[in-house]
Amino acid sequence: MALGQFFSQRFGYAAHALAYMAKKPMGSLATVTELAAWMRTVWANASETYLSNVIQRLARGGIVRSHRGVAGGYSLGREPHKISLRDVAEVLEGVSLERCSLSLGPQCPRQGGCTIQRTLRSLEEEYLRSLAKISIAELAAGMTIRIPKGVSVQRSAAL
């Protein structure tokens, strides 16, 4: 089974971008262009447009903060040790433990009595508990990230 079956591309982009941001001094800003440039050192086909969409979703979910203006960019919405992979998954994937595996929802004739649904729900709960135990700080700690040349470390005026 491929790793990609458990994690969406959107989740992968977010994890990489957040780990990069966590390696910078707290309150430092990162632009989408900077994040995309670094991500292209990890995989050449990283899309800046797709990354921008992911970062905007993270901003709407409070994981990152948007800073407008000429010297704007994004910063982490809270300290990296306070952002779990579960937080990221919930913002990006809309995690729901009530989903029927056949997408029947409330119309399922076996609602509450389906062995498959109970088993899958149990697996999903365990998966989410595991994600909750891993912070962005832990993820970043195991990474060596070189900030691309020409990128300055800008601090948010709000911090």
Where are these regions (language model features)?
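Short, Lys/Arg-enriched N-terminal segment that forms or immediately precedes the first helix
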Residues: 1-6
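N-terminal helix-turn-helix DNA-binding core of bacterial DNA-binding proteins
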Residues: 8-9, 13-46
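Hydrophobic aliphatic residues
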Residues: 39, 92-93, 131
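Basic amphipathic alpha-helical segments that dock to polyanions
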Residues: 51-61
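Beta-hairpin "wing" of winged helix-turn-helix
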Residues: 62-77
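Charged, amphipathic alpha-helical coiled-coil/dimerization segments
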Residues: 73-93, 97, 104
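C-terminal regulatory/oligomerization modules of transcriptional regulators
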Residues: 84, 102-159
